[in-house]
């Protein structure tokens, strides 16, 4: 009877610990909210900015879709940071559309003093990722080819790295229009989709069927 009592007590304690742990996980998830730009479906190209604009237009009109936004990318672009004569290397450039840029403000992702409004449209202003060791600052200029870009704002971290650190790499975020002007590339490397609350499996399948099989499709 004593052993049975101990076994029963141990089993009950295990259940209590499991439930407590589950509640703790939910609580942690609550404390760490998702970004306003978090996607439910990702479509990616392994061949650069190859996804056509028309695909976004097509998906935007489909059932179960709440928001569609795309990003373009250019890596290891020769650049010079004018405020730092010791920096003469390369930068990565990522384009954000208006929705993506607005999400940075919603998420309070920008450092104090940043002026997001300057980045919209075809401009000479960009955002830059940063961390505590970054040497660049708001107001610095970046020379890319014949273009001079001014850093209008800094992100509090680097959302493109696993640990949020820049690791000394300067990454610029531009508007759609600015990216196209600088690179001449209009296609996307990544398309992100937010679905509606009542999206069905059939809706998701229809979206996938509209995507060229040469692109990767990830339903989260």
Where does each model-flagged region fall?
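Membrane-proximal juxtamembrane linkers immediately C-terminal to transmembrane helices
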Residues: 28-46, 86-87, 184-187
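Alpha-helical transmembrane segments
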Residues: 5-7, 13-40
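A cross-kingdom feature of multi-pass membrane systems that activates on extracytoplasmic/periplasmic
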Residues: 195-220
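Short beta-strand boundary microenvironments
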Residues: 39, 53-62, 66-140, 147-163, ...
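Short, surface-exposed ligand-recognition loops at beta-strand->loop->(often short) alpha-helix junctions
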Residues: 44-51, 195-199
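Small-residue transmembrane helix packing/gating motifs
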Residues: 157-198
């Amino acid at each position: 009877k004593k052993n049975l009592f101990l076994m029963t007590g141990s089993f009950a304690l295990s259940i209590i610990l499991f439930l407590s742990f589950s509640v703790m996980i939910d609580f942690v998830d609550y404390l760490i909210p998702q970004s306003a730009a978090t996607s439910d479906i990702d479509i990616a190209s392994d061949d650069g900015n190859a996804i056509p604009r028309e695909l976004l237009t097509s998906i935007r009109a489909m059932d179960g879709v709440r928001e569609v936004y795309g990003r373009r990318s250019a890596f290891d672009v020769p650049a010079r940071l004018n405020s730092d004569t010791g920096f003469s290397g390369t930068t990565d450039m990522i384009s954000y559309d208006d929705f993506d840029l607005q999400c940075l403000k919603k998420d309070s992702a920008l450092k104090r003093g940043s002026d997001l409004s300057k980045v919209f449209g075809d401009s000479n202003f960009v955002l830059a990722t940063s961390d505590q060791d970054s040497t660049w600052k708001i107001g610095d200029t970046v020379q890319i080819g014949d273009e001079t870009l001014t850093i209008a704002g800094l992100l509090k971290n680097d959302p493109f790295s696993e640990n949020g650190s820049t690791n000394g790499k300067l990454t610029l975020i531009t508007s759609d229009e600015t990216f196209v002007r600088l690179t001449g590339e209009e296609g996307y490397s990544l398309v992100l989709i937010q679905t509606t609350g009542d999206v069905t499996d059939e809706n998701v399948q229809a979206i996938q069927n509209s995507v060229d099989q040469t692109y990767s499709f990830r339903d989260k």
